[in-house]
Amino acid sequence: MGEQLNGLKRTHMCGELTVEDVDKYVVVMGWVQRRRDHGGLVFIDLRDRTGIVQVVFSNEVSSEAFEKVQSVRSEYVLAIEGKVVKRSPENVNPKISTGEIEIYANTLKILSKSETPPFPIEDRSNVSEAVRLKYRYLDLRRPSMQKNLMTRFKITKVVRDFLNKNGFIEIETPLLIKSTPEGARDYLVPSRIYPGKFYALPQSPQIFKQLLMISGFDKYYQIAKCLRDEDLRADRQPEFTQIDIEMSFVEVEDVLKINEKMIAEIFKETLGIDVPIPFKRLSYQESMERFGTDKPDLRFGMELKDLSDIVAQSEFNVFKTALKNNGSVRGINVKGAASMPRRQLDELVEFAKTYGAKGLLWIQVFEKEVKSPATKFLSEEEMKKILERLEAEAGDLLLIVADKDEIVFDTLAHLRLELGKRFNLIDENKYEFVWIVDFPLLEYDEGEKRYVAKHHPFTAPKDEDIELLEKEPLKVRAKAYDIVLNGTEIGGGSIRIHDTELQKRMFKVLGFSEEKAWERFGFLMEAFKYGAPPHGGIAYGLDRLAMIITGSDTIRDVIAFPKTQNAVCLMTDAPSEVSEEQLKELHIKVDL
């Protein structure tokens, strides 16, 4: 059994001691990073979340502490009292913040012993993610993981401080709510008291934050847990955290402006970076046409160019078929890549096919000639205009896709990113923000044979497009906006519908009968009857934002206890079976 503190109080954190503390008697507590025995002296590197300090045990200073330290091993938890001493110049360790000093120990308490951990507690440790997640409490001791979670904490602190001083109120919304499935599946919670009835866990606080605006709270925020029973996808978590914000009496520009200031403050406080505001703005249409995606990475060029008008009369069958089927022909210019070997070109063709393209046309531009499988199918004039449109020079490689717009955009967007990485065109130290605005309000779902909301059913249409809602739904633009950073969407929001009649029209276009709409959202429709202010807001994915700011490879590295890609907690073995007794109480039978 470990020793008790018996009134011993920690005076300093390990990583915070400096030469200013020389000759002070201090008490430090933490874990043993490593132990080195040099005969008459034993050195312990003691670690806590602030860093490491070297502690020296000498028989001459304290024979009791020296004798006790002989049994100490890695990851033992110790309390040490001793005197801070300046190291001699040749013993200074510039790799650690406390490298100019060490502690000569007078007292040692072994608070807790440790078995040999399954992997070394250090950043260089080469261990599988599965083992790290199984022993997450050990993984979290590693300095990089401690730093990640401290940065995450700093982000939420900056958010709270900023919003508090700007008149926002932090309000919690319920976790047990009514199931209103639209989009991802709800996690359901059976009610024991009302057999056969279920609560849902919230996919977002969306409806409640709108109700708070109707309640008169004006400016709301919350660091909210959200849960979605989604199909398994890489780097998605069944539970995630949102920075959730809503404001009354605002238009799009008001929401964008205050959020730009908040983001700038987050980056200033966490990374020491001055982010220029206002951010760039791109309409959804422009973003798709220039980058093939509504999540553009603006750190490099290689923009898409539409070649459809140039090849409109072409006899080349590939182009002809695409244009006949209301598709398009678009291309990108990979500067200086004309000499790419045939094997790599073939790999790019296969890469394009994974995104639904039937093929990929390449054109190599050299000083005196142009090489391409399509040379014999294109007229001299067509080739000349293609080279001009793509601003081709000797040494460039042109890549062209002809198909339906969605396939052309998706393929070229992924090719652009892939080649940007291959040719080191992306500056990893750059942060390029952009607002994507004027999204389509609706999309048509071929599977369900109905219109679905691009964002959610409460998004307001642009005023000038309202009359198109029933006549030409796909032409209606939304008062919606996404914030994209380096090709990753970190947040999104909209101005909401605050009028009962317009909300009814929206539900009708989405294929909801009046009864179905009332059954799911009647409480919101009822609230609209009693004076709803114009309102709008935004939600950020905190996990994704923290991942970008910390430079992590996966969101699992910025969440304390994440699930795997298979939505499993390897540490606690959740989800797990429950007893027959528990199921009986809930009136549930498992039918597998």
From Swiss-Prot:
InterPro entries in the record: Aa-tRNA-synt_II (IPR004364), aa-tRNA-synth_II (IPR006195), aa-tRNA-synth_II/BPL/LPL (IPR045864), Asp-tRNA-ligase_1 (IPR004524), Asp-tRNA-ligase_1_N (IPR047089), Asp/Asn-tRNA-synth_IIb (IPR002312), AspRS_core (IPR047090), GAD-like_sf (IPR004115)
Organism: Thermoanaerobacter sp. (strain X514)
Annotated keywords: Aminoacyl-tRNA synthetase, ATP-binding, Cytoplasm, Ligase, Nucleotide-binding, Protein biosynthesis
PROSITE patterns named in the record: AA_TRNA_LIGASE_II
Keyword Aminoacyl-tRNA synthetase carried by entry: yes
Primary localisation category: cytoplasm
A single cellular component GO annotation: cytoplasm
Binding site for L-aspartate: E182, R228, H455, R496
Protein name: Aspartate--tRNA(Asp/Asn) ligase
